[in-house]
Curated annotation (Swiss-Prot):
Its EC number is 5.4.99.18. Pathway: Purine metabolism; IMP biosynthesis via de novo pathway; 5-amino-1-(5-phospho-D-ribosyl)imidazole-4-carboxylate from 5-amino-1-(5-phospho-D-ribosyl)imidazole (N5-CAIR route): step 2/2. One of its GO terms (biological process) is 'de novo' IMP biosynthetic process. This is N5-carboxyaminoimidazole ribonucleotide mutase. GO terms for molecular function: 5-(carboxyamino)imidazole ribonucleotide mutase activity. The gene is purE. It comes from the Bacteria. Transmembrane segments: none annotated.
Length: 161
């Protein structure tokens, strides 16, 4: 496994699945797991502290509400942690975003956008990180970016179908 995708609860999976979908597109192996910072703190500590020795290179952590999962995962590992704020009902994910982005100096979490765009971009960013040491992954990322460009160039007029 190259990427660990963790989330605070099973209800976060519909959002976090977009990270997995992007990794699938780039041929990057991953594992998924529910690891709650509040309900299973020891599981979180064990998961994050053992990730490197298990071959994980990047952790994508999605959480809503108080959203302590990404920061706590980062506290237990030296691996890059990408935080995805999962949209919440009460504050539409702003609470999650602020919880993830406001990390103390010395414990870094790369924070993505709220919700589905953030999860998809976390998958892309993880592939880009891995691609710095794996040309086959980087080639797939570059092909994806070129495809996006071609799609826009092929349909420049929004009034046309």
């Amino acid at each position: 496994m190259k990427v660990g995708i963790i989330m605070g609860s099973k209800s976060d999976w519909p959002t976090m699945k977009l990270a997995a979908d992007m990794l699938d597109q780039f041929g990057v192996s991953y594992e998924t797991k529910v690891v709650s910072a509040h309900r299973t703190p020891q599981l979180l500590a064990d998961y994050a502290s053992s990730a490197k020795e298990r071959g994980i290179k990047v952790i994508i952590a999605g959480a809503g509400g108080a959203a302590h999962l990404p920061g706590m995962a980062a506290a237990f590992t030296s691996l890059p942690v990408l935080g995805v704020p999962v949209q919440s009902r009460a504050l539409k994910g702003m609470d999650s975003l602020l919880s993830i982005v406001q990390m103390p100096k010395g414990i870094a979490v790369g924070t993505l956008a709220i919700g589905e765009a953030g999860a998809a971009n976390a998958g892309i960013l993880a592939a880009q990180i891995l691609g710095t040491h794996d040309e086959s992954i980087m080639a797939k990322v570059e092909a994806f970016r070129n495809e996006q460009t071609e799609t826009v160039l092929a349909n420049p007029n929004p009034a046309e179908d």
